[in-house]
Design a protein with these regions (language model features):
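Structural core segment of the AMP-binding/adenylate-forming
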Residues: 1-15, 106, 110-177
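Conserved AMP-binding/adenylate-forming core of the ANL superfamily
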Residues: 32-36, 41, 52-86, 92-106, ...
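A short helix-loop-beta submotif of the ANL/AMP-binding
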Residues: 76, 89-90, 96-124, 133-138, ...
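Conserved AMP-binding A3 loop
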Residues: 64-66, 184-215, 220
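Adenylate-forming
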Residues: 96, 141-148, 242, 282-290
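Conserved AMP-binding/adenylation subdomain of ANL enzymes
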Residues: 207-240, 245-287
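Flexible, non-catalytic linker and terminal segments flanking ANL/adenylate-forming cores
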Residues: 1-37
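Conserved pre-ATP/AMP-binding loop-to-beta segment of ANL
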Residues: 52, 171-188, 194-195, 225, ...
């Protein structure tokens, strides 16, 4: 990235969106993006401008930004009306990477609640420890992972395979904004030194990470253009192979793609190099992080 430093500084100096100044953040003076969104709700609302452009591609399913926004509103209504989820409450997500994982993440933060991304590789007993500690209003899960906890779980659970959001008629009337330094999600450590711990991640943190990635991407694009490489011919498409319960899959992947208006190709199943290469070629993938 060192070769792009001058392009990064030029963008900071010339583009209001990337302007940086100092602010007091919880008692500490820090460099921040001056004109940043103040809530992940802004990401959701801004996504409407991308209309019918694909946001998520998963197996043979394509979900546009418009469709995603509608599904998020439906999921948020379910959380509010059926499970009394309020700002600060927790919603646990225990599933493999899939569109529903992403939809319920956005639905959760859109009403000021906290998404708890449980490690999808955990055994049932490990998941139960995290669930009991977080005490969510509801768990959303795929069938495979619910089966691991079915005989122990005490919390209400929504199973993705039993839930067809497209058939649900009611939608959230209005999103709920909370302070940018409030928690948006809990992601868990690996547990190499003991029991995995939930790490609080704020709206501010996720917004800053996404904005920084967009800045770096713009700088790399300008650097490439100066060497005769034109990326503008390809539709921005990212390949998501990292788990959504990890910051690389969620914040760097799905969240940034929504903000940037890029298409996210959600990989499913065990990582197979040949399969990945074919997907990259088929969908003309322009970015892949891990």
């Amino acid at each position: 990235m060192m070769h792009s430093d001058k392009y990064i500084q030029a963008l900071i100096d010339s583009q209001p969106f990337f302007e940086v100044n100092q602010e007091n953040v919880l008692g500490v003076e820090m460099d921040v993006f001056k004109n940043r969104p103040r809530s992940l709700v802004d990401f959701i609302e801004l996504s409407a401008s991308h209309g019918e452009k694909p946001y998520l591609i998963y197996q043979d399913k394509v979900i546009s930004f418009d469709q995603h926004l509608t599904l998020v509103k439906k999921a948020a209504h379910i959380l509010q009306s059926q499970h009394n989820v309020k700002p600060g409450d927790r919603v646990a997500i225990y599933a493999a990477n899939c569109p529903e994982w992403i939809i319920f993440f956005w639905a959760t933060v859109s009403i000021g609640a906290i998404a708890c991304g449980l490690n999808g590789w955990w055994k049932g007993s490990e998941a139960i420890k995290a669930i009991d500690a977080a005490d969510p209003n509801v768990i959303v899960s795929d069938q495979k992972r619910f089966d691991r906890i079915a005989d122990q779980v005490k919390h209400p659970t929504l199973i993705f395979e039993d839930l067809d959001l497209s058939l649900y008629e009611q939608e959230l009337n209005s999103f709920i904004r909370i302070d940018e330094d409030e928690c948006a999600c809990l992601l868990y450590t690996s547990g190499t030194t003991g029991t995995p711990k939930g790490v609080m991640t704020s709206h501010r943190s996720m917004i800053a990470n996404s904005t920084l990635q967009m800045l770096q991407g713009a700088a790399v694009s300008q650097h490439s253009s100066s060497h005769g490489i034109d990326w503008s011919k390809n539709t921005p498409t990212s390949l998501l192979t990292s788990p959504l319960f990890h910051v690389s899959g969620l914040s760097a992947g799905a969240v940034t793609s929504l903000f940037a208006g890029s298409t996210t190709l959600v990989y499913d199943g065990r990582f197979l190099a040949d399969k990945v290469i074919k997907l990259i070629q088929k969908f003309s993938v322009t970015s892949w992080g891990g």
